[in-house]
Structures are given as C-alpha cells and as structure tokens.
Curated annotation (Swiss-Prot):
HAMAP family listed in its UniProt record: Xylose_isom_A
Reactions listed under catalytic activity: alpha-D-xylose = alpha-D-xylulofuranose
Residues the entry annotates as binding Mg(2+): 306, 308
Gene Ontology molecular functions: magnesium ion binding; xylose isomerase activity
Cofactor binding mode and count: Binds 2 magnesium ions per subunit.
Cofactor: Mg(2+)
Protein name: Xylose isomerase
Keyword line: Carbohydrate metabolism, Cytoplasm, Isomerase, Magnesium, Metal-binding, Xylose metabolism
Swiss-Prot/TrEMBL GO biological process terms: D-xylose metabolic process
Family membership noted in the UniProt record: Belongs to the xylose isomerase family.
EC top class, as a word: isomerase
InterPro entries: Xyl_isomerase-like_sf, Xylose_isom_bac, Xylose_isomerase
Quaternary structure, from the entry: Homotetramer.
Length: 436
C-alpha cells in the first residue's frame, strides 16, 4: 500500500545504457550473470536508514532543510517512517537495508523506554520484511549522538556510560538477531579524544577491548551467526579516533585476541580521510583476513570533510570491486549506501535518483572488475612480477630454512648481483583504462 510520499513513481526498472530516464537503471541489471553469479548477489545493495530517512539536511552553518512528515519523536511517526522506508526499498529494488536503533525508534526517557520502543518497532519491521522480502544487512547502536556519549561510549571515563552503552548494544544485537540480520556493526564515532590533556589512552584502549569482548561473547551466547564488524574512521567527530584505519584496527584485534572473531566494514569516505585509497584498505583487509563489508560513498576531495556523497566515479569503483572480487567477494557483507542527498535536493524523487546513480556506478565498476579478473589483466603481470618467490629458493627463504649468515654465504658463493626490473606502472594504468 502506497504512503503517497513518492507520488505516482513506479518501481525502478533496468532500461539499458541508452535510457535517458532518470528513474531507471542503465547498468544495474540484477539478473545479469557476472563471473557465474547474479549481479544482485555480487553487490548485495543496502539502503542506509539514517541518511535516507532521518537526516534533516543540516550543516555546520544552517539547520534543517528537509521537511519530512515523520520528523518527530513518537511511535506513530516511527511507523510512518517505516512505511515510507519499506515502500522506498520496494520501489528501488534494494534487497537489504541497515539501521541504528536511534534511526528507527523514538528516544525514550531512559534505557527501559528505549528498549520498549525498539522492541515495538522491531515487531513492525518483522512484518514489513515478511511482506516485502527485504532483508536486514546489519544493525547497529547509535552511541554517539546523545549528549551522554560526548566523551565516548566504551571509552568513557564514567563506568555508568560504559554500562549504558553495553546494555544498548545488547538490545540492538537482539533486534538484529530477531530480524535475521546478517551482520552487526560497531562504529566508534566518539571512541577517541579531543585532547590528550584529559585522556588516559591505555585505560581507554583497555575499556574498548573489554567492550568488544563482551559483544563477541554475547554473539555466541545468543547463537548469532552473522559477522561482527568494526567500521574504521580516523576522525570526525573526535579529533583522533581509535579505530583509525584497517591496520590500526587489526593491531587492536590482535592485542585482544579477536582477529578471528571480528571483521571490518570499510567505508570509501573514511579511507580517504585516513590518507588511503579505498582499494588500499580493501586489499589490506583481504591480506589480513578481516574483510567483511563496505559502506559505499565518496567525499568531496576539496573540502577534506566526510561528505557522504553518492559514488559517481567508475574507475574508482572498478578498482574497489576488483579487490572485493579478488578476495572472493562478499560472504555475509554487502554494499551499503552510507550516502546522503545534498541539502538542496528536496524532492522525494531525489532519494531514488541518488541511489539509482550509485547503483549504476557500482554495477559498471563490478563489470569492469570482473572482466579484468577474467582476462587476468592485472593478476598475470602481478604473478610475473613475483615469480621469483615461487621458485624453490624463494620458497625456502620464506619458510625460514636459511639463517641470515647462510643467506650471506649463499649470496657471496653465487655472486648474486640483482638488477632492477621495470614496475610497468604506466602500462598497468593504461590496461585498467581499457576496461573502464
């Protein structure tokens, strides 16, 4: 049943690359087979509940620009928002969605009321999922917006805030589990500091380790089969965030013995803020065995802010999905659009247009990446470059069969005097451009 919010807009369909219809897909054909799998099953698109339905359109210099009929803290408004959201998922053809607890329920006066409100809306969502076939990619807790979290959640100097945060995560994990969510995400927006003058770094890192262990223990207790995912970000809103990037989070997981329990949800915009390319973070996560899922967006490269715009750069998407496919593709993860409209994009249709463009961009990137993999366009040059390490002597070096002094004797005896070889960067860049 239509809410009327989207007027007479029909379900978005694939019309092919020659279409000029802004409310049609030009490249995303969910049933097209790519590398033996349907495109929908490769990409596993999800809509972010927060940016799509709760963001008011503000910025640091101005307030709300979006006037949504569900913008008030009542259960009636929360259910109207859910009606519009699931209508949107159906119109767009998105197989998944994601949410924070604070996105979907009205704020209560205490923890008990928050839990009651969340449980009520979860029951409502369960019926919506049954009616539409839309599934939950992941759930999470908002532990950063309310003023109680201004000094952190897990890393707060007040143990009562730690306890409140842990209890909130417990209820959100229960909600995610009940709705059949395939992952549970932790983003530490306030887990960091503004100044070291009032921060005990070791204590806060120990607190964060204990918190994450509690989450993993509870996952196993309730039989949740999805992945626990951490989402790295270097700063914003804190000056320095503890889950800075993939490498930092891996070190934290190793320190706490959780590298086999927790994987990462990697966002394109956060990678850029950390001074990395998106594909670097994806490749490193795959190399370390902790890749889980992605948040898809882009930043304005001039502003230096995390602007959360819809992706529109096909070459970037091609290299990103190349790393995803090279690592074996998504398991329980997917492509969540952590993207929001610009504050001047006021029309309901703009919500669809933004997602359509992003989905088309990702689809083009996926197809280019798949073709590069099929043709071994990058993998063969890479294998040739490292071929020496596959030789008998190279493998002995890696296995530790030679000591340092034995290696020195070997180099002298064989008169080894290696000469450098071209890295062929320009050729490889030109090869990529053939596909995009």
């Amino acid at each position: 049943m239509s809410t009327g919010f989207f007027g007479d807009i029909a379900k978005v369909k694939y019309e092919g690359p020659d279409s000029t219809n802004p409310l049609a897909f030009r490249h995303y054909n969910k049933d097209e087979v790519v590398l033996g799998k349907r495109m929908e099953d490769h990409l596993r698109f999800a809509v972010a509940y927060w940016h799509t339905f709760t963001w008011p359109g503000g910025d640091p210099f101005g307030g709300q620009t979006f006037l949504r009929p569900w913008f008030n803290e009542t259960m009636e408004a929360a259910k109207l928002k859910a009606d519009v959201a699931f209508e949107f998922f159906t119109l767009l053809g998105s197989p998944y969605y994601c949410f924070h607890d604070a996105d979907v329920r009205p704020e209560g006066k205490n923890f008990a009321e928050n839990t009651k409100n969340l449980n009520e809306i979860v029951d409502y969502f369960a019926q919506k999922q049954a009616d539409t076939g839309v599934k939950l990619l992941w759930g999470t807790a908002n532990l950063f917006s309310n003023r109680r979290f201004m000094s952190g959640a897990a890393t707060n100097p007040d143990p009562d805030v730690f306890a409140f945060s842990a209890a909130t995560v417990k209820t959100c994990m229960d909600a995610t589990h009940k709705l059949g969510g395939e992952n549970y995400v932790l983003w530490g927006g306030r887990e960091g500091y503004e100044t070291l003058l009032n921060t005990d770094l070791k204590r806060e890192l120990d607190q964060m380790g204990r918190f994450l262990n509690l989450v993993v223990e509870y996952k196993h207790k309730i039989g949740f089969k999805g992945a626990i995912l951490i989402e790295p970000k270097p700063q914003e809103p804190t000056k320095h965030q503890y889950d800075y990037d993939v490498a930092t989070v891996y070190g934290f997981l190793k320190k706490n013995g959780l590298e086999n329990e927790v994987k990462l949800n990697i966002e394109q915009g956060h990678a850029i803020l950390a001074g990395h390319s998106f594909e670097h973070e994806l490749a490193l996560a795959n190399a370390l065995g902790i890749f889980g899922s992605i948040d898809m967006n882009r930043n304005d490269y001039q502003s230096g802010w995390d602007t959360d715009q819809f992706p529109n750069n096909v070459p970037e998407m091609s290299l990103a999905y190349y790393q995803v496919l090279a690592g074996g593709g998504f398991k329980s993860g997917g492509t969540n659009f952590d993207s929001k409209l610009r504050r001047q994009s006021l029309d309901p249709a703009d919500l669809l247009i933004g997602h359509i463009g992003g989905m088309d961009c990702c689809a083009r990137g996926l197809k280019a990446a798949a073709k590069m993999i099929e043709d071994k366009a990058l993998s063969q040059p890479l294998a040739d470059r490292y071929a020496g390490w596959d030789s008998a002597e190279g493998q002995k070096l890696l296995r530790g069969e030679y000591s340092l002094d034995q290696i020195a004797q070997w180099v002298e005896a064989k008169d080894i005097n290696p000469q450098p070889k071209s890295g062929k960067q320009e050729l490889l860049e030109n090869i990529v451009n053939r596909y995009v």
